[in-house]
């Protein structure tokens, strides 16, 4: 998703593409990415997410206003093909727009410091941030996270097969 979006939307100046085989530990994967980064802040986007264009345009102002270690970003989750049964099974909250669990805040913009790292192999949690803020729950300041119900079911089966029940809880 992100590579297609980047090719269509962004000038590649200053953007580096790096790949690494996933070893089953998502925190290790994210910490590897941190080690590749330079600069004061890191804007971490998962491979199946993309930012609203306004969010990108306003990043310098967001960082100036929010002099914090971590900025939580609202995320628009869309799941094509879900049914009311899926909503009940997974305990989702669905908005009038069909967004799942909005604003589903994600830790995505954080200072590039050695003490800020990800922990937990699944449903990772960021540690080391002492100060934080949340962007308002507005679509133009959000990440998009589109998927199909088939992908959601496959993802849940992978998590259930490869991670303990305790690890599979946020």
Where are these regions (language model features)?
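Walker B catalytic motif
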Residues: 47
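Acidic donor-binding segment of Leloir-type glycosyltransferases
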Residues: 1-23
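Alpha-helical structural signal in soluble globular domains
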Residues: 5-9, 36, 62
């Amino acid at each position: 998703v992100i590579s297609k979006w980047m090719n269509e939307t962004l000038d590649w100046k200053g953007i580096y593409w790096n790949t690494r085989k996933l070893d089953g530990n998502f925190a290790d994967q994210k910490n590897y990415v941190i080690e590749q980064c330079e600069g004061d802040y890191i804007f971490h986007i998962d491979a199946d997410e993309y930012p609203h264009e306004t969010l990108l345009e306003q990043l310098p102002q967001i960082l100036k206003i929010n002099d914090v270690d971590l900025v939580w970003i609202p995320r628009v989750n869309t799941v094509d093909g879900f049914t009311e049964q899926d909503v009940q099974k997974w305990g989702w909250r669905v908005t009038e727009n069909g967004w799942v669990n909005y604003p589903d805040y994600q830790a995505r913009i954080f200072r590039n410091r050695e003490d800020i790292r990800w922990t937990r192999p699944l449903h990772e949690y960021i540690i080391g941030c002492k100060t934080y803020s949340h962007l308002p729950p507005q679509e133009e300041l959000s990440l998009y996270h589109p998927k199909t119900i088939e992908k959601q079911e496959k993802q849940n089966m992978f998590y259930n097969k490869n991670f303990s029940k305790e690890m599979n809880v946020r």
